């Protein structure tokens, strides 16, 4: 019988042989888009802090003040004593931003999706997922016990055909997608998805983790499709808003049920006061500075034009390399030039589609974007 350590070591060896082993690398972000690794300063194009708010003086001051008033942690589940006043204030602000009736805040985006889906789907139901949906959407569907049916990426015809085949035999149906896809940067056709859902009595879930704060003056991807009906608007506080946590915006009835039945809310400690206060301060900035929210996409589009890629739809630009080792080599070559662009490999992306995932911030200097484009252009031409 193999020991536990032998089992782990064997798996690590196989992953390393396939260039798929991942390791943590201590990284210090002191301010802006400059990070330090192994004593060397690099310009990062791998951070999701799209607006640079994680180090904004007003955001940091709000977090510090919240600690002074409420303490470092929430101390308990929200249903016990962890529902500090900042959480209801944050929920009201998020609901207003997303044009929803109500909102509930979770400890993270992952917890939001893995709490949401099992609350509204179970045995006898179906969950149809975009094949490229985020891992936490898949995890939530798996936890639910519902039948999981993937549909081809952004293919509403395929979705409609699957619903025509399976909807009548299911009690309820959820259709789940990213609003902005985290590895490809493209946007879901929420208007068409909504129409298909309405025609087939299905509930649409959109994960807008990478859209809020940077699209439609900060309102996110759903605001690009004002006619779309999206009963579940999920998102995070950890990217453009520079803090931490997740949320679901929905009707009051949906939110009330989540607050009493979502296991990841009921059995998790409430979001710390500092994180909630930081997110509130970030929302103030997003609402007051629409020009700031437009910068990440503008910089991404300047880059795609420079390297000969189609115009970016979001601040995320993938440069497909192919094999995992080749993507690692490309990342190391850019690091040697002073840029941190992390290689994304399977299983995060499909086999043969390892890539450089380039994330643009409002704080990236235009001259450095141009220099990065010069270095990346040969990889684009090679495809």
UniProtKB/Swiss-Prot annotation:
Substrate binds at residues 22, 134, 348. It holds the Pfam family Aminotran_1_2. It comes from the Bacteria. Its EC number is 2.3.1.47. Transmembrane segments: none annotated. Pyridoxal 5'-phosphate binds at residues 109-110, 182, 207-210, 236-239. Belongs to the class-II pyridoxal-phosphate-dependent aminotransferase family. BioF subfamily. This is Putative 8-amino-7-oxononanoate synthase. The lineage of its organism: Bacteria, Pseudomonadati, Pseudomonadota, Alphaproteobacteria, Caulobacterales.
């Amino acid at each position: 019988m193999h020991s536990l350590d032998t089992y782990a070591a064997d798996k690590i060896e196989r992953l390393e042989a396939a260039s798929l082993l991942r390791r943590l690398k201590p990284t210090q972000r002191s301010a802006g888009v400059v990070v330090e690794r192994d004593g060397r300063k690099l310009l990062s194009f791998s951070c999701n802090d799209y607006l640079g708010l994680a180090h904004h003086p007003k955001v940091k001051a709000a977090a510090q003040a919240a600690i002074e008033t409420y303490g470092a942690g929430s101390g308990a589940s929200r249903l016990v004593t962890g529902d500090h006043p900042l959480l209801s204030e944050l929920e009201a602000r998020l609901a207003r931003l997303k044009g929803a009736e109500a909102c509930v805040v979770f400890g993270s985006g992952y917890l939001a999706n893995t709490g949401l889906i099992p609350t509204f789907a179970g045995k006898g139901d179906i969950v149809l997922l975009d094949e490229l949906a985020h891992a936490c959407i898949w995890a939530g569907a798996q936890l639910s016990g519902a039948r999981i049916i993937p549909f081809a990426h952004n293919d509403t015809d395929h979705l409609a055909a699957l619903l025509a085949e399976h909807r009548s035999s299911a009690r309820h149906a959820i259709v789940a997608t990213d609003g902005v896809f985290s590895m490809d940067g493209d946007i879901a056709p929420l208007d068409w998805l909504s129409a298909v859902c309405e025609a087939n009595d299905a509930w649409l879930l959109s994960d807008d983790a990478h859209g809020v704060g940077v699209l439609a003056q900060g309102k996110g991807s759903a605001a690009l499709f004002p006619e779309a009906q999206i009963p579940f608007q999920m998102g995070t506080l950890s990217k453009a808003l520079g803090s931490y946590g997740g949320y679901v915006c929905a009707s009051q009835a949906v939110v009330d049920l989540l607050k009493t039945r979502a296991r990841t809310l009921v059995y998790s400690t409430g979001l710390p006061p500092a994180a909630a206060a930081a997110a509130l301060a970030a929302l103030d900035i997003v609402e007051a500075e629409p020009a700031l929210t437009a910068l990440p996409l503008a910089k991404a589009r300047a880059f795609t034009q420079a390297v000969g890629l189609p115009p970016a739809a979001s601040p995320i630009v993938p440069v497909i390399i192919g094999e995992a080792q080749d993507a690692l080599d490309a990342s190391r070559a850019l690091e040697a030039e002073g840029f941190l662009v992390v290689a994304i490999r399977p299983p995060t992306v499909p086999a043969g589609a390892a890539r450089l995932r380039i994330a643009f911030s409002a704080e990236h200097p235009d001259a450095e974007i141009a220099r990065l484009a010069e270095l990346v252009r040969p990889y684009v031409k090679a495809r």
